[in-house]
Each structure stands twice: as structure tokens, then as C-alpha cells.
UniProtKB/Swiss-Prot annotation:
The lineage of its organism: Eukaryota, Metazoa, Chordata, Craniata, Vertebrata. This is Zinc transporter SLC39A7. GO terms for biological process: B cell differentiation; intracellular zinc ion homeostasis; regulation of ferroptosis; skin epidermis development; zinc ion transmembrane transport. Residues 43-56, 66-114, 295-313 have a biased composition (Basic and acidic residues). The gene is SLC39A7. The modification Pros-methylhistidine is found at H66. It comes from Canis lupus familiaris.
Length: 469
């Protein structure tokens, strides 16, 4: 009994250690510093410097006749050229308007055109990367976030879905459900809503209007679409793989189906009695030598075997659904890494660390779901590696896509439009339909308490990671 309780306690200690690591990193990084660093990486200036530029007070004469609109396109001029626009709130020699602070197509003595990205305002630090180095960094970071959680799986003392590992597997499943729900509600959906609520080109005094409800409504519809799509896929897979599996849900239905070949419909009033009589007649007719012992064997065994077949089929479908959701989620992680490295090496490293902290508990939960669905430990680990294809594809898409805003999770507006909320809907479906029902089985009070703590641990882990982002 001591050995049986050791593994769940070991998992609890591991979860608490990981939570402490998240708190340590969160306290060290700080939300304000992260926001300032990201702002400097995205726009090339800090709030302090822009404030000084507004009150610099210099005034130069400009002779090229550029209009106010031309300033927004990032034209640069030397110090001997200048202009006096009364409607500008600064007199700096670059001649950039207030709106141009969101773009970085200017310089002191030479021109730059980076399409929204570029070098950091810090002197002596070159942030833009050549093409080969950019691809090497981005793909290397993607391989890292895919391989690091894979090695963590070796430490989990679960080999298969057997009674010997059942208690530990249930705790891991509860942790997986908490991680999936926390990921959907605290990470994916907020990131999908964030570009619509805090657009960088939005006017400071612009109020909310009814037109802004459209994107928010579309995010909600995509979440529901993900739930419905996963429901349709599960029904389709059950229909193709299960076929007659639904008629085996109860032992009495099974017996009636076999006995109905030689009898009419007069058996329906007394279903239980007649099905047992049919089994007895069939046993006496086809297996006369075994007599009643066969009926006693087949009676309790048939419902058990059919129920196990049904349960195994259900869990296999849930495993496939979880792999599909994990593949889409890894695609968004790849988009985040590729887009962040396009914004600069420092931003790319920061995003990689954040995604890595997020992926380790997530992969542990996915591993538990795969093992519960009938996979061995090696099979589950191989399937987890296959989902890395989604991350590599997302990174390649982010690097090949020109333009677009750099977000913490998507490149441009493509991913935030439907990938994130659709994936969130898939996570919600897998957690509530496939994983949580497994936690409703009868268990001891201690086991039930550990399962609830595991679920809360998964949610708390996502809260800590959300603060880091």
C-alpha cells in the first residue's frame, strides 16, 4: 500500500515544484519590464524616449515640400533638411508624426525599411537577422520546445493503462483536464481577443463602438465551431470504427440480437427473462456438453467484454481528438516562435522560454490522455513527437509570411482570426467530454482529493504562465 501511494505523492511534489519555478520566473521577470521590453523590440523605442522626443523643442526648415501624409510613410531626412509643421507635437529632426511612432522606417543618416520590424533602439545591439540565421534560430527553438517535454515523459512511472498504474494515471488525467481548460480560457481565447481590444494603431481617444463587437462575436463563434467540429469528428469516427458497437452497450441487448434469428417479436414484453432463456437454449443446442456452466460463464462475461470493447473504442476516439487539438495548438506555438524571431532575437528567446514553460505541463497531460486511450508509453511518446510537425509548420508559415503584426501567439491576423479560438473549442470538448467523465469513477476519498488537487494544479499552472505572457 505504501508503494501505491508513493507515485501520486511523487507527482504532487513534482507539480508543486513546477509551480514554484513558475512563480520564481514570474517574480523575476515582472509584467512591467516584459511590457517595456516587448514595446522596445516591436517599435524600437521606449515610452521614456518618446516622451523626451515630444518635448525636444528643435525646429528645422524643410525644403522638399513633403505633405503630412508623406511623413506617415517613414520618409527620413538629414539634419540639414527640416520642416516646420505646426500640427506636429514635436520638432525632432526626423520629422516623424505622432502616428509614425508605431513604425520604425526612419534613421539619423540612412534609411531603413523593415516592414514593421527592425533594430532595437538600444545602441550596439543588432536585432534584425539575416535569412539563414533567422530560420536556424526559429526552427531550432521549435525543435527545443518539442523535444524538451518529450524527455520529461521518461520520468513518469506509467507504462500502460493497467490497474497497477490506475491511481497515478487518474491524477495525471485530472491535471490534463485542468491544463486543457486553463489553456483554453486563460491563454487561447484571451490571445484571440487581445488584438481586437488593444490594436497598436488605435487612436488613444477612440471609444468603443458597435463595430468592435463583430470580431469579439466571431471569436465566440469560432470557439463553438471547434466544439461542434470535434463532436462531428467523434461521431464520424465512432460510426466508421464502431459500426455495430452501439448495440453492444448492454448485455441484454446483445443476447436478444443473437436470439432473434429464430423467434418473432413476442419476446419484447419480458426482455430480461427471454434473453436469458435464449442464451440457455443456445447453450443447450450448440454446446450441449457444457450445459449450464457455459451459460453462467457467458452471462457475466459478455456484458463485461462488450463494455470493455465499448470503453476502449471511446477512449481511442478521444485520443485521436486530443492529438488533433494538440496538433493545432502546436501550430499556433510555431506561429508565435517564428513571428517573434522576425521581431528580434531577444524577443524570440523570450517567447521560446514562455512557450516551453507552457508546453511541459501540457505535454504531460496529453501523454496521460493517450495512455488512458489504450496506448503504451512508447506509443504515446511517439505520437507526441508527431505533433511537433504542427509546430514546425507554424514556424515556417510565420517566417514565410510577409508583414503582419507580431503577437505573442500568432503572426499577422491569420492565427488570431480562427486558429486560436477553434483550438480552444477543441480543448474544451476534449476536457469536458473525454477526460472529466473518467474522473467520475468511484474512488477512495484520498484518491478523489488528489484528483481535485491535480485539476486545480493544472489551472494554477496556466494562471502562472498567463502572467508571464
Amino acid at each position: 500500500m505504501a508503494r501505491g501511494l508513493g507515485a501520486p505523492h511523487w507527482v504532487a511534489v513534482g507539480l508543486l515544484t513546477w509551480a514554484a519555478l513558475g512563480l520564481l520566473v514570474a517574480g523575476h521577470g515582472g509584467h512591467g519590464d516584459l511590457h517595456e521590453d516587448l514595446h522596445e523590440d516591436f517599435h524600437g523605442h521606449s515610452h521614456r524616449r518618446s516622451h523626451e522626443d515630444f518635448h525636444h523643442g528643435h525646429s528645422y526648415a524643410h525644403g522638399h515640400g513633403h505633405t503630412h501624409e508623406s511623413i506617415w510613410h517613414g520618409h527620413t531626412h538629414g539634419h540639414e533638411h527640416g520642416h516646420a509643421h505646426e500640427d506636429l507635437h514635436h520638432g525632432h529632426s526626423h520629422g516623424q508624426s505622432h502616428e509614425s511612432l508605431y513604425h520604425r522606417g526612419h534613421g539619423h543618416d540612412h534609411e531603413h525599411s523593415h516592414g514593421g520590424y527592425g533594430e532595437s533602439g538600444a545602441p550596439g545591439i543588432k536585432q534584425d537577422l539575416d535569412t539563414v540565421t533567422l530560420w536556424a534560430y526559429a526552427l531550432g527553438a521549435t525543435v527545443l520546445i518539442s523535444a524538451a517535454p518529450f524527455f520529461v515523459l521518461f520520468l513518469i512511472p506509467v507504462e500502460s493503462n493497467s490497474p497497477r498504474h490506475r491511481s497515478l494515471l487518474q491524477i495525471l488525467l485530472s491535471f490534463a483536464s485542468g491544463g486543457l481548460l486553463g489553456d483554453a480560457f486563460l491563454h487561447l481565447i484571451p490571445h484571440a481577443l487581445e488584438p481586437h481590444s488593444h490594436h497598436p494603431l488605435e487612436q488613444p481617444g477612440h471609444g468603443h463602438s458597435h463595430s468592435g463587437q463583430g470580431p469579439i462575436l466571431s471569436v465566440g463563434l469560432w470557439v463553438l465551431s471547434g466544439i461542434v467540429a470535434f463532436l462531428v469528428v467523434e461521431k464520424f469516427v465512432r460510426h466508421v470504427k464502431g459500426g455495430h458497437g452501439h448495440s453492444h452497450g448492454h448485455g441484454h441487448t446483445h443476447g436478444h440480437t443473437q436470439g432473434s434469428h429464430g423467434h418473432g417479436t413476442q419476446k419484447y414484453p419480458s426482455k430480461e427473462k427471454q434473453s436469458s432463456e435464449e442464451e440457455e437454449k443456445e447453450a443447450n443446442g450448440s454446446r450441449k456438453r457444457k450445459g449450464g456452466s457455459t451459460r453462467l460463464k457467458d452471462g457475466p462475461l459478455r456484458p463485461q467484454n462488450s463494455e470493455e470493447e465499448k470503453t476502449g473504442s471511446d477512449l481511442r476516439v478521444s485520443g485521436y481528438l486530443n492529438l488533433a487539438a494538440d496538433l493545432a495548438h502546436n501550430f499556433t506555438d510555431g506561429l508565435a516562435i517564428g513571428a517573434s524571431f522576425r521581431g528580434g532575437r531577444g524577443l524570440g528567446i523570450l517567447t521560446t522560454m514562455t512557450v516551453l514553460l507552457h508546453e511541459v505541463p501540457h505535454e504531460v497531460g496529453d501523454f496521460a490522455i493517450l495512455v488512458q486511450s489504450g496506448c503504451s508509453k512508447k506509443q504515446a511518446m511517439r505520437l507526441q513527437l508527431l505533433t511537433a510537425i504542427g509546430a514546425l509548420a507554424g514556424t515556417a508559415c510565420a517566417l514565410l509570411t510577409e508583414g503582419g503584426a507580431v503577437g505573442s501567439e500568432v503572426a499577422g491576423g491569420t492565427g488570431s482570426g480562427w486558429v486560436l479560438p477553434f483550438t480552444a473549442g477543441g480543448f474544451i470538448y476534449v476536457a469536458t467530454v473525454s477526460v472529466l467523465p473518467e474522473l467520475l469513477r468511484e474512488a477512495s476519498p484520498l484518491q478523489s482529493l488528489l484528483e481535485v488537487l491535480g485539476l486545480l494544479g493544472g489551472v494554477v499552472m496556466m494562471v502562472l504562465i498567463a502572467h508571464l505572457e
